[in-house]
Regions:
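Cytochrome P450 C-terminal beta-domain/meander region
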Residues: 151-169
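Glycine-rich phosphate/pyrophosphate-binding beta-alpha loops
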Residues: 148, 173-179, 222, 265-269
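N-terminal glycine-rich flavin-associated loop
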Residues: 98-121, 149
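Buried hydrophobic positions in well-ordered alpha/beta secondary-structure cores of metabolic enzymes
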Residues: 20, 89, 119, 141, ...
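Glycine-rich beta->alpha junctions and the first turn(s) of the following alpha-helix
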Residues: 2-12, 213-302
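Amphipathic, small/basic residue-rich leader segments at the start of a protein or domain
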Residues: 1-104, 125, 129, 161
Length: 302
């Protein structure tokens, strides 16, 4: 495998370094002091969109080939694929502040599930606005509940069929960016006794009756990132908003879709951890050097 960073990705990394010094790190410090997320109307998000961030992997009904193109010049570095470039950029953003990094506009954690599970109409309706992003917009994902965290098979939010609609009843917590999102991909169960087999995912739009009581969670860290709890009080969702349609779940595929979403993000989480670790090391060394640390050679010589 070729680990060389192509010129385009390197240029984006360098631009992020400048953005990190000017905006990302200061916004993270400000959020820590104020104890609240960076507001969605902040000019930083406009700037980020202007740099091309927040767009979806979905290419529209016609689609496009996103595989790296071979260069005619054998000595020229090939442009790396989107996944590898995303890892490097996520690492760089998290170096400056992970809370600000994960607050970035975009379709959110549910993007992968919509692409892999959604109908063509659902992909077009919910992801096409993110193809050519002209302003900051967000999508969100809601799986976690007060009594169901990593054990996603234990979710209790109910989905009850009512004619052509579904009625959602339950509570969600730690849903990233959900109060500012155009839609939330909400996971619920048609029957808790079915365990994983009862899972269903619904595209719940902002403003739907019964989607209410948004509350930003208080956390020890990631203050710039909006982690939200909310309630579904008999929230009525059209049948067409069931992700993938009813036939998709006949093979107990709901849980597989949820896990595919999480699995797709694991490399990004690892990249972010590397960025945070690099930042912690650099800050620690800078502090030790500036304070001389009794001229300890273990610090002085590094």
């Amino acid at each position: 495998m070729d680990f060389a960073i192509d010129r385009t990705t390197q240029q984006r990394i360098e631009k992020l370094q400048a953005l990190g010094r000017e905006h990302i790190r200061p916004l993270g410090i400000e959020a820590d002091k104020l104890g609240r997320p960076t507001p969605p109307e902040h000019p930083y998000f406009e700037k980020l969109v202007g740099m091309g961030y927040g767009r979806t992997r979905y290419k529209g009904r016609k689609g496009q080939d996103d595989t790296p193109k071979k260069s005619a010049d054998k000595n020229k570095t090939k442009r790396m694929g989107r996944s590898r470039a995303s890892l490097l950029l996520s690492e760089q953003m998290s170096y400056w502040d992970r809370g600000v990094a994960v607050s970035a506009p975009g379709p959110g954690l549910g993007e992968g599930a919509i692409i892999s599970m959604g109908t063509e109409d659902q992909k077009e309706r919910y992801l096409s606005p993110f193809i050519k992003l002209d302003k900051p917009r967000w999508g969100a994902f809601a799986m976690t509940e007060p009594a169901a965290g990593s054990d996603v098979a234990s979710i209790q939010t109910r989905a009850i069929k009512d004619g052509d609609n579904w009625v959602l009843i339950g509570n969600k917590s730690f849903s990233g960016n959900s109060s500012r999102s155009d839609f939330i991909l909400v996971w619920a169960t048609v029957d808790p006794s079915l365990g994983r087999g009862g899972h269903r995912a619904f595209l719940v739009e902002r403003g739907m009756p019964g989607l209410q009581d948004f509350h930003i969670e208080k956390k020890m860290g990631l203050k710039a990132y909006e982690s939200t709890s909310f309630r579904l009080e008999e929230c009525r969702v059209p049948g067409e908003n069931l992700l993938g349609g009813e036939a998709y779940y006949e093979s107990r595929a709901g849980f597989k879709g949820a896990m595919a979403t999480f699995n797709a993000t694991r490399p990004l989480i690892a990249a972010m951890a590397v960025g945070i670790g690099r930042s912690a090391l650099d800050e620690s060394l800078a502090f030790a050097r500036e304070n001389q640390m009794l001229d300890d050679p273990r610090v002085r010589d590094r």
